[in-house]
Structure formats: C-alpha cells, structure tokens
C-alpha cells in the first residue's frame, strides 16, 4: 500500500493506492457516511455498502445533470445529512463527479471522499478536485474545484470491469505517460497487455505512477491556469467525439491523442519516429486512432469547448514523449487540421 498527499486550496487530499474499501472506517467515522453509488456498482458490490446509508445516483453521462443533483440533495435531506456527514462517491468518474459536486453545494459544503471503481477514475477522475456536471450535452460545463478528503484506490474493485472500461483507463494512463513520464510510456510498450489483463504488479506500477504525476501537476496549478492544462491532452477533440459520435470516453481519448500527435507532426514539433511509436502503442492497446465523425460537425462542437478564449482554442501538443506544449489554434487552423488529418 502506498499513500500520497495532494495539498489543495480547499484542503489536503489523502490518496491511498492499494487500499481496501472494507477498511473505509479507518479513514472516516463510518456512522456519518452517506454513499452516493453508481447503480451498477451498487448491484455488484451490495455487500460492501450494506452497512451504510446510500443513494443510487444512476449511471452514465445522463446522470450528470442538475436535475439529478437536485434529486440527490433531496435524498440527502431525507437521510438526515448535516455538516458532520461525509459523502463517499462509489463508482467511476460519473459517480465521483456527482458526489463531489453534490457534497460541495449541499449546506454550502460537506466533507467527501471517493472509492473509485474504474481504472479511469483511479488514475484520473477521482484525483485533483474537479467536480462537475453537464449542461445541454456539454461535458463538465458546470462545476467546482474542491478536493476530496480521501481517495481509496482498491484494485479488487476493478475485477468486475468489462474490457471496454479497462481500455478507457488505459487511454488516460497513456495520456499521463505522454505528457510527463517517458519511462512509463516505455513500460507500457512492453507491458500494456499485462495492464489490460489487470495483472496486479502492472496495475500497481502504472496506477501509482499516474496518480503521482497528476498530483505533481495539480499541486502547482490546482485551478488550471497553466500547468494543469496539459492534462487536457487529447481531450479537446475527445469531448466533441463523445457528443457527436456516441463513442466511449476511452475510444474518444485515443482518437484525440492521435489527432493532437498528428498536428504536432504537421507543425514540425514532433519527429515522425516518435509519432509512429505513439500510434503503435495506441493501436496496440486496442484503442482506435482514426476519427469517424464528419469534420464539419466536429468543428462546431469543438469550437464550443470551454477551453476556447479570445477567438482561439487552447490545444496541447507534443514536442516529444514527456514534453507537452500548450498552443492556440484559430478556427481556420482547426478546420484545416480536421479536414486534412481526420
């Protein structure tokens, strides 16, 4: 077991890699817990939550709405939540977002923590203090920065994941390697298949490295004014693909990373040899690299991304593995790249 700390403006977050949800009472007074649990997780792990008050928050992106938050807050009232209550989000990124957002606004803020049950949430969504919901199809456009008190990373919870969910987490791990950990990238080239098979030592290695990298970045830029923007590598296009093409987050991130990599090559920032290594790893893991949606539809959706400012869109590109650079694309440049590279 490995423990990491993230010191944020809203408090310190304790991230325990290799923890067990069975030991939740060691981290918070179990008598004051209300769990906000993903529907599928609640069904699969009912024995782990049976001793707690809990609320079913649904599943999937459709659950991340203000209407859902309103219903959850009513249930918190019904269950007698007060300012001594600790909310625990149990599930993937959606459940963590919902739990963090609801806890942050209920009674002007309750303490909360996460027990992420997907690989993606364990390496990314549960760490960093971003908690948001969607509006009119636009992801995480409403949200807060607020650090969870704890994140319990229990590898046993991954055993019920379908292959597509494991792949989604692998995409985020590749992202972390590309923006800040060349050694992990090389490890994935040799051991990516072992990660997908959830071999314990491979999971421990990459989850620990991914969590440490994200903590390092968030610690110096909690509110995403500079360094933290690098974590958006591959995600600007990915969010648009999820909306227009109806594909999974992991698939969209794979395509988004390849798009950004190809722009990097086209701009002369990245060598062809490195571009080929990146594509080989993405395809080797089973992630798609080619974009299926129409360029025109993607352009309109991407251009509404919340990362746009002053007539240009911030885009994270690469100079090398582990060397990201934040640049800006105007609408004409983006349109040209979507036409030429997709």
Task: Describe these PLM feature segments.
Residues 186, 191-294:
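Active-site segments that bind and position negatively charged phosphate/pyrophosphate groups
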Residues 59-60, 90-92, 233-234:
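Glycine-rich beta-strand-to-loop/alpha-helix junction loops that act as flexible
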Residues 101-194:
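A glycine/threonine-rich phosphate-anchoring loop and its flanking beta-alpha core
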Residues 171-173, 270-342:
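C-terminal charged capping/lid subdomain of soluble metabolic enzymes
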Residues 73-90, 99-114:
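Non-catalytic interfacial helical region
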Residues 1-86:
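ATP/NTP phosphate-donor binding region
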Residues 94-101, 122-123, 240:
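Short glycine/serine/threonine-rich phosphate/pyrophosphate-binding segments
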């Amino acid at each position: 077991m490995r423990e990491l700390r993230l010191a944020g403006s809203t408090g310190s977050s304790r991230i325990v890699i290799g923890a067990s949800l069975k030991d939740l009472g060691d981290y918070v007074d179990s008598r004051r817990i209300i769990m906000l649990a993903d529907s599928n997780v609640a069904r699969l792990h009912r024995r782990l939550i049976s001793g707690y008050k809990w609320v079913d928050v649904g599943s999937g992106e459709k659950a991340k709405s203000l209407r859902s938050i309103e219903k959850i807050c009513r249930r918190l009232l019904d269950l007698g939540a007060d300012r001594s209550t600790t909310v625990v989000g149990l599930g993937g990124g959606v459940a963590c977002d919902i739990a963090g957002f609801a806890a942050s606004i209920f009674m002007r803020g309750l303490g909360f923590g996460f027990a992420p049950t997907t690989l993606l949430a364990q390496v990314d969504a549960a760490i960093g203090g971003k908690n948001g919901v969607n509006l009119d199809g636009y992801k995480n456009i409403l949200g807060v920065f607020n650090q969870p008190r704890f994140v319990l990373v229990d590898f046993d919870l991954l055993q019920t994941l379908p292959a597509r969910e494991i792949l989604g987490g692998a995409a985020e791990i590749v992202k972390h390697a590309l923006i800040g950990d060349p050694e992990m990238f090389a490890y994935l080239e040799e051991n990516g298949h072992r990660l997908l098979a959830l071999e314990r030592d491979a999971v421990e290695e990459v989850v620990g490295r991914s969590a440490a990298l994200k903590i390092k970045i968030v610690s110096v830029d909690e509110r995403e004014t500079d360094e933290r923007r690098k974590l958006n590598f591959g995600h600007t296009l990915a969010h648009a693909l999820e909306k227009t093409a109806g594909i999974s987050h992991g698939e969209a991130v794979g395509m988004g990373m390849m798009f950004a990599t190809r722009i990097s090559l086209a701009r002369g920032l990245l060598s062809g040899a490195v571009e080929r290594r990146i594509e080989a790893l993405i395809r080797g893991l089973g992630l798609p690299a080619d974009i299926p949606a129409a360029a025109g539809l993607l352009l309109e959706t991407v251009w509404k991304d919340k990362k746009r400012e002053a007539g240009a869109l911030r885009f994270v590109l690469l100079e090398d593995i582990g060397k990201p650079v934040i640049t800006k694309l105007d609408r004409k440049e983006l349109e040209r790249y979507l036409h030429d590279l997709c």
